[in-house]
């Protein structure tokens, strides 16, 4: 069985890890042993935060809808309840965008909701 020299694969592996650690501060970006740990930790943060991002955006959308609905004289919870009763199935992302960029349309939806809640 021939002897296997690992120089080529080791260099490739080191290059790959150091490329992933590009832009890291200090030795985390240029020393393989430390960069390897930093890249692994960065991957863990990325995995965790891809899930956290969904929660954060939902919170943002709700805060925006709440602010816009309060300017029309109702709270977010009242507005959400009214949407359900009125049978309006627009998601929070679209409602949030509408509240910012098209307040007239959002106002029309609020009026529909108020009418349904009053009835």
Swiss-Prot record:
Cellular component per GO, a single term: ribosome
Recorded GO MF terms: rRNA binding; structural constituent of ribosome
Matches recorded under Pfam families: Ribosomal_L20
Gene Ontology BP terms: ribosomal large subunit assembly; translation
PROSITE patterns assigned: RIBOSOMAL_L20
Record keywords, A-Z: Ribonucleoprotein, Ribosomal protein, RNA-binding, rRNA-binding
Database matches in CDD domains: Ribosomal_L20 (cd07026)
SUPFAM superfamilies (UniProt xref): Ribosomal protein L20
PANTHER family (UniProt xref): 39S RIBOSOMAL PROTEIN L20
Protein family per UniProt: Belongs to the bacterial ribosomal protein bL20 family.
Role this protein plays: Binds directly to 23S ribosomal RNA and is necessary for the in vitro assembly process of the 50S ribosomal subunit. It is not involved in the protein synthesizing functions of that subunit.
HAMAP family: Ribosomal_bL20
Protein name according to UniProt: Large ribosomal subunit protein bL20
Species this chain originates from: Polaromonas sp. (strain JS666 / ATCC BAA-500)
